């Protein structure tokens, strides 16, 4: 706790634009709560802020003494929530092995369209990049395909609610537990069972909305169709099997969306 407080004081004076919250820190790792829209790694040679860059600034002393910044569980730019970061080579190797052995447990919260007919469901469906098998206007878009990598996700309904919007009125808060770690896994699996994530520009109501967003940015039309400017997915829990875990609540934007007109 003292180390976290010291970090906060240093960043208040040195880096006032710190864009994440420190949840826990030891000599081996730091756990942070990433806000939506913050990139994990640089994707272009620009000055856009990234979690990796800010962590390197935060851990400059450790890096100068032989440490490193190794992000263990990567999140998409729009996904918020917990990220585990190794500060040493030994810790990075250890966490990598835990990931391979599926001993690093991850749980997400997602807001989806509609009320599922089930309370708990396991989706076991292999995923592959769509462009390998058919035309795809979006290079990174994934699809369910038997030739792809195995992927399994467990879903549980946490809350059903009604909210009057321009695009629908029934929504659910879902807990998603991925048993594998494929690209866009939770989003594709939810879309495949007819309940895409609210705000999802690629797997939501129409993939052309993503292309429109790339061309024009956020518009009134996109807001009316998607309701949220980012997909409603949050990394809510991380746990090392048999050791310890971390939790973080829904961020303000998703918590406010879950304030229903009526809850079932």
What are these regions (language model features)?
Residues 95, 182-190:
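Short beta-strand segments enriched for Tyr within beta-sheet-rich domains
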Residues 12-29, 35-40, 167-168, 189-264:
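Pseudouridine synthases involved in rRNA/tRNA modification
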Residues 33-34, 84, 110, 155, ...:
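Residue-level signal for inorganic ion chemistry
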Residues 47-50, 100-104:
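Glycine-rich, phosphate-binding/catalytic loops in enzymes
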Residues 1-15:
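Intrinsic disorder/low-complexity segments
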Residues 85-87, 111-113, 177:
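Short hydrophobic/aromatic beta-strand micro-patches
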């Amino acid at each position: 706790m003292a180390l976290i407080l010291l970090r906060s004081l240093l960043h208040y004076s040195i880096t006032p634009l710190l864009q994440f919250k420190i949840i826990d820190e030891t000599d081996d790792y730091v756990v942070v709560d990433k806000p939506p829209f913050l990139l994990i790694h640089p994707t272009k040679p620009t000055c856009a802020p990234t979690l990796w860059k800010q962590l390197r600034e935060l851990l400059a002393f450790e890096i100068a003494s032989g440490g490193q910044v190794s992000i263990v569980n990567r999140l998409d730019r729009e996904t918020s929530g917990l990220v585990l970061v190794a500060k040493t080579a030994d810790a990075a190797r250890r966490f990598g092995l835990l990931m391979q052995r599926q001993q690093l447990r991850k749980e997400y919260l997602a807001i989806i369209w509609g009320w599922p007919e089930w309370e708990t469901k396991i989706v076991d469906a292999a995923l592959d990049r769509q462009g390998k098998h058919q035309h795809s206007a979006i290079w990174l878009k994934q699809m369910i395909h038997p030739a792809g990598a195995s992927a399994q996700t467990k879903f549980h309904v946490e809350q059903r609610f009604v909210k009057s919007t321009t695009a629908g009125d029934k929504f659910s808060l879902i807990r998603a537990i991925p048993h594998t770690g494929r690209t866009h896994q939770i989003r594709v699996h939810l879309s495949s069972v007819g309940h895409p994530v609210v705000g999802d520009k690629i797997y939501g109501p129409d993939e052309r909305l993503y292309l429109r967003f790339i061309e024009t940015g956020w518009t009134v039309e996109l807001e009316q169709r998607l309701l949220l400017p980012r997909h409603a997915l949050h990394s809510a829990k991380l746990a090392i099997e048999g050791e310890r875990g971390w939790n973080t609540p829904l961020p303000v934007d998703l918590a406010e969306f879950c304030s229903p007109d009526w809850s079932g």
